[in-house]
């Protein structure tokens, strides 16, 4: 069964990008992103994992795309080196700026002729088309590939927006700051016909890439911190999806779903689905409670992997955050209650847990990145005493 057919049978969708009637709110976000795409403004989109970044980008890309404006989407999560990046970048630019597979090989050889590219094209052109390079001149490789969008845009008389998901992955490359400098030096000269939308799921790394004055991408474009969808929109969305499938859920129960998962987009959809699947005609408190148990059970193995390797002090620090402690962790009563050792441990634990993507540190708030993990953690993981 294809994805669209599956969507027709499911009132709620999670774990993948959503579209159409499964996409709710983000109206102001979509307007801002649409204006940036249309007017050639570079965009940096930052938020924790599974808040709907990819869905938003794909929605806006579909809305603004036309014969004069091409949107290229690529995901670099699998890239482990600059060479991986160059291959994926070149491949997707070529694939997504032409509707005719016959042009792909021709364009690769024409626009990348200085690199003598190797083209492979199998029985399935879309999935089997690949570009590779055997050039030893790294500067030439960098310049030729990164300028590919400009060359194509100029030849076709169009504008191109290149959207790169999991952009923080470049921090894992060898000599990452040098690579960032190379990207910035080329991309900042392409403003006439090419712009970029850079986004990723590791908020602390994305923030470090774009918000620190010492980093090459500082002030590269419009830094866009995505917020959670508001409760009112979610309530309406949940009730409509139930109604359209011949079922009913009260505004109060829809509110409980949202509040339980702290308006986390993916979990609102998942918990709503679990409640819906248990509902005969009208959703009840029993359906809601049973769905919560299922949600914890479905994620239990994942949460066990989260805590593997954590020290007793780190686990105890998570307990403090789970109980709503936001600051002043060095107070004697907090250190004593949660067995945090010494005050010198606090900053190290915060940094370590943020790097592991378990917590989100805002100026006045520290929270769990995953609200259901917080519930599971409080329920199943005890405070450890030495």
Locations of regions flagged by a protein language model:
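A short, basic N-terminal segment
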Residues: 1-43, 48, 360, 372, ...
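C-terminal leucine-rich, beta-strand-based interaction scaffolds used for sensing/assembly
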Residues: 2-10, 297, 301-386
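P-loop NTPase nucleotide-binding core
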Residues: 41-42, 46-51, 55-161, 170, ...
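Alpha-helical DNA-recognition elements
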Residues: 63, 274, 352
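Conserved Walker B catalytic segment
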Residues: 132-202, 211
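Short regulatory helix/loop adjacent to the ATP-binding pocket of P-loop NTPases
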Residues: 203-221
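Conserved AAA+ ATPase "SRH/arginine-finger" region at the nucleotide-binding site
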Residues: 222-233
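Amphipathic alpha-helical "lid/sensor" segments that cap RecA-like P-loop NTPase cores
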Residues: 235-301, 363
